[in-house]
């Protein structure tokens, strides 16, 4: 289909976003064209500002507009407890829960030999250096419950074991309100493994 070049460029730009196909990209492009010019400028400025002003915390790797980030500099948090996550979005999910009061370490990915991603390609070396420099008592591995996340957690736990730091894995299992009959075998197995006393 023919579009004027500015629209084609806009559609191509939206198509680069995850989960956005050509039809959705075209819909978004035409939506933007119908917005007020001030709103479009604010939107464009917000994109540019986020890209320019945000970086990764030099301590934990989380996205921040200050370095070190607000979590790393918060003295009320328990520095002896570090939760290892794959992505900054995982930190946000944990923070919404308002139950974890330790600190974080963001890996920015997971080990995936099939994709050519090894431990050196994610933030594992910085984690190991951090464990040497800080007085950490427990490392909570909160990587995703998929093959890559499990491989990453296993690798880190084996790497950390000689240090004597307690290493735990978050439990995986059934969602609240879920029915057993709809759960797959792996989910049920993980739920059973993660059981606790009541």
Swiss-Prot record:
UniProt name for this protein: Recombination protein RecR
GO biological process, one term: DNA recombination
Entries under PROSITE patterns matching the protein: RECR, TOPRIM
Chain ranges of the Toprim domain: 80-175
Keyword line: DNA damage, DNA recombination, DNA repair, Metal-binding, Zinc, Zinc-finger
KW Zinc (keyword) present: yes
A Pfam entry, by short name: RecR_HhH
Domain of life assignment: Bacteria
InterPro entries named among the record's database cross-references: DNA_Rcmb_RecR, Rcmb_RecR, Rcmb_RecR_Znf, TOPRIM_dom, TOPRIM_RecR
Species in which this protein is naturally found: Oceanobacillus iheyensis (strain DSM 14371 / CIP 107618 / JCM 11309 / KCTC 3954 / HTE831)
Keyword Oxidoreductase among record annotations: no
Protein's job: May play a role in DNA repair. It seems to be involved in an RecBC-independent recombinational process of DNA repair. It may act with RecF and RecO.
GO MF entries: DNA binding; zinc ion binding
Family assignment from sequence similarity: Belongs to the RecR family.
C4-type Zn finger ranges: 57-72
């Amino acid at each position: 289909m023919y579009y004027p070049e500015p629209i084609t460029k806009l559609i191509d730009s939206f198509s680069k976003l995850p989960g956005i196909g050509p039809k959705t990209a075209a819909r978004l492009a035409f939506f933007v064209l119908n917005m007020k010019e001030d709103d479009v400028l604010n939107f464009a400025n917000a994109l540019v500002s986020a890209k320019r002003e945000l970086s990764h915390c030099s301590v934990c790797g989380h996205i921040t507009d200050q370095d070190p980030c607000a979590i790393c500099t918060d003295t009320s948090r328990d520095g002896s407890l570090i939760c290892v996550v794959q992505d900054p979005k995982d930190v946000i999910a944990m923070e919404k829960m308002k139950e974890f009061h330790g600190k974080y370490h963001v890996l920015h990915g997971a080990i995936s030999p099939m994709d050519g991603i090894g431990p050196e390609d994610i933030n594992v070396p910085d984690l190991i250096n951090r464990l040497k420099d800080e007085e950490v008592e427990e490392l909570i591995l909160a990587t995703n419950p998929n093959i890559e996340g499990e491989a990453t957690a296993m690798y880190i736990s084996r790497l950390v074991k000689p240090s004597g730091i307690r290493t735990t894995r978050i439990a995986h299992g059934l969602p609240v309100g879920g029915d057993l009959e709809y759960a797959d075998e792996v989910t049920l197995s993980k739920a059973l493994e993660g059981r606790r006393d009541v």
